[in-house]
């Protein structure tokens, strides 16, 4: 995908380069779940934490014509790419992208929050496929010493910004389910279900704010 600077994801083709993760088919589960839990004509506000190329947020906005979305990413290069993709898909009138880390983002209240944060622990990064570790941005993969450092920040921020009964969809590592569920419950989230990926690993937790 990096060689041709494009990648098909959901129903669109997105511009990508070495500054963003290549969208994975497993991540399309996030979009399916948002569609499943929302109405087509609903006017909802959605936040994408760690937006990267913008592919998740923009795919949802293509399916939900009355949604408005915001995406944040700590990488300026990523935000430039997400803005480019929004313009290319004619969705820039319903999206805003911000260069920001999770802790310092204070804008808005949201009906839906989605996030695919870095969740790979430091030591495991060395064991990844060579194509991944050599070409994809470490910033988007590195979840800190135990793999939870960014997940904790995302859960804390979502708890502050999500509306009551709001939908939170979080992608996780295959061995992180139990600890993340505990974190979510401690922050006042009700666990609706855990989704598996195509390899039958736990991959997404769907919850709502009580």
Predicted regions and their residues:
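Conserved AdoMet
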Residues: 1-37
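Conserved beta-strand segments of alpha/beta enzyme cores
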Residues: 13, 68, 94-96, 190-193
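Conserved SAM/SAH cofactor-binding pocket of Class I
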Residues: 29-127
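Class I S-adenosylmethionine-dependent transferase superfamily signal
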Residues: 34, 60, 132, 154-158
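Conserved RecA-like P-loop NTPase ATPase core
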Residues: 86, 116, 132, 154, ...
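Helix-to-beta-strand junctions that scaffold the AdoMet/dcAdoMet cofactor pocket
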Residues: 91, 136, 162-164
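Mobile active-site "lid"/loop adjacent to the S-adenosyl-L-methionine
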Residues: 119-150
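Conserved Class I SAM-dependent methyltransferase catalytic core
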Residues: 145-208
């Amino acid at each position: 995908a990096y060689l041709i600077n494009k990648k098909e994801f959901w129903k669109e083709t997105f511009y990508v380069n070495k500054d963003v993760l290549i969208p994975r088919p497993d991540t399309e589960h996030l979009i399916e779940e948002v569609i499943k839990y929302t109405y087509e004509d609903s006017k909802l506000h959605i936040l994408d934490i760690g937006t990267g190329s913008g592919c998740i947020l923009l795919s949802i906005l293509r399916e939900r014509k009355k949604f408005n979305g915001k995406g944040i990413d700590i990488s300026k290069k990523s935000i430039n790419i997400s803005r480019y993709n929004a313009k290319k898909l004619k969705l820039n009138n319903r999206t805003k992208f911000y260069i920001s880390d999770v802790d310092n983002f204070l804008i808005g209240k949201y009906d839906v929050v989605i996030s695919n944060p870095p969740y790979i622990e430091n030591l495991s990064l060395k064991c990844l496929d060579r194509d991944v570790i050599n070409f994809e941005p470490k910033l988007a993969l590195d979840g800190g010493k135990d793999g939870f450092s960014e997940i904790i920040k995302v859960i804390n921020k979502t708890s502050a910004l999500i509306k009551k009964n709001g939908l939170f969809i979080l992608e996780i590592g295959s061995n992180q389910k139990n600890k993340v569920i505990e974190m979510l419950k401690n922050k006042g989230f009700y666990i609706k279900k855990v989704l598996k990926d195509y390899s039958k690993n736990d991959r997404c937790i769907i919850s709502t704010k009580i």
